[in-house]
Amino acid sequence: AGEDALASVVVLKDGSRIPADLVVLAMGVRPETSLAREAGLDIGSTGGIKVDEHLRTSDPSIWAVGDAVEVIHGVTGQPCLLPMAGPANRQGRIAAENVLGRPTTYKASFGTGILRIFRLTAAGTGANERMLRQAGMPFAAVHVHPMDHASYYAGAMPISIKLLFDPTTGRALGAQAIGQRGADKRIDVLATAIQAGLTVRQIAQLELGYAPPYGSAKDP
């Protein structure tokens, strides 16, 4: 809600008002499953269409992919909705393989995503704190604020990175990063590490490409 077209103030449910220079509406999406319901397909607890690991629905002659499909989260193991272009694209290719008689599986989604906000890049992968709490999974968090490449090399810019991990096993559970440069590279590395089940100590031992314009010898 705003006082004019520039959205100069946000009005909360309790009536309090917060002045704002910019308001970003990020409401998410809701799966459109009316056609699936009319066809008698099973709908999952999240409201998405239930599919097996081959993306086949409860009707063996129908496959389903994309934003309206319920998937298993790769970290929590729980059913969830992750309406994202990357997984949807991969699901489409996997479903096509299965339709053509080449059995291929889609095991889980890890929610790896990225977007640009003006000059900043924000990215994330794995589970966030809310998801881990809902799943009853213990976690610890570490925040680091390194430069995107060697600080002595011209043009270095700060990045903020948050990593969630199991405090007992050290297994990486989720990560977020934001910065003008370098957030995409770090999240892709962490997404790979999370999907591989690596611990924070194993991640620290990864050998990554290094040169002063691209990173640090001790990369975050």
Please describe what each predicted stretch is.
Residues 3-11, 16-97, 189, 193, ...:
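FAD-site-proximal beta/loop scaffold in flavoenzymes
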Residues 10-12, 16-19, 106-110, 167-169:
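A short alpha-helix capping/helix-coil boundary motif
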Residues 18, 125-127:
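A broad, structural micro-motif
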Residues 27, 118-125, 134-220:
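Flexible, glycine-rich terminal cap/loop adjacent to redox cofactors
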Residues 42-46, 102-112, 138-142:
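A short alpha-helix-loop-beta-strand transition element characteristic
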Residues 79-83, 98-125, 205-211:
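Active-site-proximal substrate-binding core of FAD-dependent oxidoreductases
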